[in-house]
Amino acid sequence: MKKYLSILVMASLLPFGAYAHGPSGQKVEKKFEVKAEPAKVWALVKDFGAIGKWHPDVTNVKVEEKPDAETGKVLLHRLVSLKNGTSFLEKMREANDDEMKLDYKMVDGADSTIAVSNYRTVLQVKPSETSGQTLVIMTARFYNKANTMEAPPGADNPAANKASNELYDAAAIGQKSAMEK
C-alpha cells in the first residue's frame, strides 16, 4: 500500500515539475580571421580597459578593481557605454596568456541595460591556418534580459540574440580595422 501511495504522490507532482523550468540558454559564436600575428591580436584584446580602442560602438570605458559579489575576490571591472545608449558592467574572470583566452562576464544590475542577463564571453585567439594571420573565436552564453520564458518584447530571446550578434559583429569589424592598418 505504501508503494502505491508513494507512486500516486510522485505522479501528482509531475505536472509541477514542468513549470519549474526557466528560460532557455542562448549561445552566439563568431569566428573571424585577422591579418595580424596572434601575439599582436592577443595584446590588443587582453587589455580589458582598451575595448574602446578597437570596438567601434564603444563611446566610453571606465575600469576599476573591486570585490566580486560572487567570489569576494578583487577583479577588474569595466563599465562600457555604447553609441546606442546601452551600457553594461563586465568583470574579467580570467586572462590566460598560454591559451590566449579571455573569460569575462556581464554583471547584471542597474549598470547593464543591454537586452541580456547572465552573459558570459570567452574570447580566444589562435594561429590561423594562413601564416601571419589569427583566428579569433568569440563565444557568448546568456539568457534574455527578463530571465523568463514569457519575456516581453525587447527583453526576450530574439532581442538578446540580436544584441549579442550586433556586439560581436561590431567587435569583428573593430578588431580587423585596428589590427590590419
Would you name each region that the model predicts?
Residues 35-39, 93-100, 124-135, 180-181:
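A short, structured loop/turn motif at beta-sheet edges
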Residues 1-4:
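Positively charged n-region of N-terminal signal peptides that target proteins for export
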